[in-house]
Amino acid sequence: INNNFYPEFDGITLRKNLAVFYNNKYNMNFDEENFIIGYGASGLLSLIGEVFLCCGDELVTSQLTFESYEISAKRNGAHYVEVPTKENLQINLDGILDAITKKTKMIIICNPNNPTGMILKEEEIKNFIMKVPENVIIVVDEAYFEFIDIPNYKSMMQMIGNYPNVIVIRTFSKVYGLAGARVGYAIMNKEISVNLIKGVEFASSLSALEGAIAALNDVEFIKKTKEVIKEGREYLSKEFKKLGFKVFPTQTNFIYVDTKLDTKFIAEKLKEKGILIRGDLLLSRITVGTMKQNKRLVSAIKDIISNEVL
């Protein structure tokens, strides 16, 4: 890679590769104009917000979901509307439909959801999309889609042809292991991409774009990664249940856990043992690591619980 040159500002080569990849995988009819490359999924969320949201608009989404949605809304002066989840923490699609008003410009559905890891039934999302007014942009965040372990479960890319208000977001940060490269992409109707592409200055760095192209077709790496994550997910779920924790069903590379303990205290003790957990999510959302890392985490938690009064 000759980094003496600037990258393609719109990532056209990667976009062409993505079109071929999904046409072959899902029997779609995409071309490069159906794709936009961005600085990670978060960068794309910012871009989409800048184009479609303004002061007084509403962005409707679920409670207990990815924090960047709220940032995107408030950055553009839009009102952020959170719809409570169902009792089992699943996204309440009917509730989101009920929350739509004349001011609603955008809806975001994270599937699988972050931080819960839970997934919606394919038919539920399809029916939901059909009921949303056509003037409302529907963003389906599928950042963790590749981890789904359900045979024949289809992406909402399938809806783009008939529903031009649908945008699907994907990323190379998760299953492809390129979080530091910051390469995300959005799939959409060409009518929408024409407006979004105007906001792209440089999609990403030259090295990141080339790395994404190489990773896209690395079938063996993806297969191995999914196997490692599935094994680690099952191990952590089993061990946490033994400790009396409530473990929510997940289709991602992390698990959502209700410990019913003083999570801030445990996080501090884990930090003393060289194990860091993000912010105030603490023991709620735990990313699956290597088996060595997973066992070290479980051992540390057991040690803390047995030696401290919580």
Where are these regions (language model features)?
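N-terminal small-domain helix-loop-helix segment of the aminotransferase-like
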Residues: 1-42, 47, 308-310
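Active-site pre-lysine segment of PLP-dependent enzymes
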Residues: 74, 91-102, 115-138, 142-173
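PLP-dependent aminotransferase class I/II
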Residues: 165-240, 245-248
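Conserved PLP-binding catalytic core of the aspartate aminotransferase-like
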Residues: 234, 239-273, 288
